[in-house]
Swiss-Prot record:
Record's subcellular location: Cytoplasm
Gene3D superfamilies per UniProt: 3.90.950.10
UniProt-listed InterPro entries: ITPase-like_fam, Maf-like
Keyword annotations of the record: Cytoplasm, Hydrolase, Nucleotide metabolism
Organism annotation: Clostridium perfringens (strain ATCC 13124 / DSM 756 / JCM 1290 / NCIMB 6125 / NCTC 8237 / Type A)
Identification of the protein by name: dTTP/UTP pyrophosphatase
Family matches, as CDD domains: Maf
Lineage: Bacteria, Bacillati, Bacillota, Clostridia, Eubacteriales
Primary enzyme class: hydrolase
Catalyzed reactions: dTTP + H2O = dTMP + diphosphate + H(+); UTP + H2O = UMP + diphosphate + H(+)
Superkingdom: Bacteria
UniProt-annotated site: Important for substrate specificity, residues: 11, 71, 155
Length: 192
């Protein structure tokens, strides 16, 4: 059975390559702005990932396992997604500075052969160092934070700001590897 990653994220591709030998990338065209956060962060990221997977699965013509994910940073009851602009990135990074936040990723697997849907969620706590405005501006000027939830990438320059994590490192990158591995074990595909 074919494996399809419903994401254009190079980080998700890199993570999936660790456990699945062959897969295709098909970007989801689902509009994330059609789902509003209503207080339940786990439901929110699972709903987003499920809708991404559904959109891709409807375009496929052969039996496949479609994998989709959505990752957000959550702090003080607020969802921090990708920054809209540099000012938004500055605001996000300033709020993360010296504090602990949580990163939630929802994953969804759809088996298009029998239309079974599996969703799950992972959470990782991340502790940030205290950052001054110059450090934040320099990081924003690198361009790295602009396409990442919470305006930082733990696997890149943003990793220098992380004092520690509790939970899955790959979840912070955008795809909870252990949860995904366990979910994929239920399918007849080659993993590892």
């Amino acid at each position: 059975m074919k494996v399809i990653l419903a994401s254009k994220s190079p980080r998700r591709v890199e993570i999936l390559e660790k456990i699945v030998k062959e897969f295709e990338v098909v970007q989801s065209n689902f509009d994330e702005n059609t789902i509003d956060f209503k207080g339940d962060i786990e439901k929110y990221v699972k709903d987003l990932s499920r809708n991404k997977a559904i959109e891709v699965s409807k375009r496929l013509n052969e039996p496949s396992i479609v994998i989709a994910a959505d990752t957000v940073v959550f702090q003080n009851g607020k969802v921090l997604e990708k920054p809209k602009n540099e000012e938004d990135a500055f605001s996000m990074l300033s709020s993360l500075s010296g504090n602990t936040h949580k990163v939630y990723s929802g994953i969804c697997l759809i088996n298009t052969y029998d239309d079974t849907v599996v969703t799950d969620c992972d959470c990782t706590e991340v502790r940030f160092s205290e950052l001054n405005p110059r450090q934040i501006r320099n990081y924003i000027n690198s361009g790295e934070p602009m396409d990442k939830a919470g305006a930082y990438g733990i696997q890149g320059l943003g990793g220098a700001f992380v004092e520690g994590i509790k939970g899955c490192y790959y979840n912070v990158m955008g795809l909870p590897l252990n949860k995904l591995y366990k979910a994929l074990e239920n399918y007849d595909i080659t993993i590892l």
